[in-house]
Amino acid sequence: SVVPFYKLTSLPGNGNEMISELEGMKMSGYTMADITGYWEQDNENGTGFYIDNEGNVSDLTCLYGVEKYYSVKYHSAEVILNGNSCVISSLGSQWMVYAVGSNSLLAIDRNNNSLQVEHFVKKDVPDEMMRADEIMKAPVPAGLLGKWETIHYTRMINGENVTDIDILNGDDWNKQFYHTLAFSENHKISKWDRFGSQLYDQCFMLKGDNITIAEDLTNLLFPKYSYTETWTISDKTENSMKLTREQDNTTECYTYKRK
């Protein structure tokens, strides 16, 4: 008997779409425009990276609390684009781009000996990334930058002074209040004790006269899941500044001088 042979004219499932996309993918001559945007690994883990127009890479990891949200590691690396080679460093991997299209990116992790090709899908930029961009690109006023040294501390409860002291370097009791702050352009705030030991290296954002401080950028984005402090610049000159915080019936105020 004769078994008729029919020419294969289509592929099952979304195979035709995949073949069509592969035919249109670039495998060399990459430009920055080819890879900008948010790319998420096609494994349902919600892990991906965002590349801006300047080639800065930000890592995003999906977390689950009361709701789904993304942690952001802002500008953790820069794309290496050299001729026909494109390498994207993200979360410990060095992704060497094999091919890129309008909605798909294929890459091999140079840090993994298996040389397995991984698929990334282009998706809408998560809100967390856009908010992180807004925070980190907001200019820090020049008058706030640099180091500030505590010289006075007050604490009031129900409007009455409980503590009202000058900060003296030689007073052991006062050392609990003494610290130096440093604000930097990259929205980092560092804190030292009076002996010069660094206590904290945190992140901050500005909104009007309010400074909100958290352990890192992700905690700034989601204060309900983490501890944050918000201080108000209640008075400011070129070389002095007061930071005030109100909590319930308690008001704290630190007076600083420029160091």
Specify the residue positions occupied by each region the protein language model found:
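Hydrophobic residues positioned within well-ordered beta-strands of beta-sheet architectures
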Residues: 3-4, 20, 37, 118, ...
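Extracellular glycan-recognition regions
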Residues: 10
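Mixed-charge, low-complexity intrinsically disordered segments
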Residues: 156-173
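Short, low-complexity, Pro/Ser/Thr/Gly-rich segments in the mature regions of secreted, periplasmic
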Residues: 251-258
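Contiguous, well-ordered beta-strand patches that form the walls/edges
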Residues: 1, 42-50, 56-116, 154-156, ...
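Short beta-strand edge segments in extracellular beta-sheet folds
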Residues: 121-123
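N-terminal helix-cap/turn-to-beta initiation motif at the start of protein domains
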Residues: 13, 21-40, 127-149
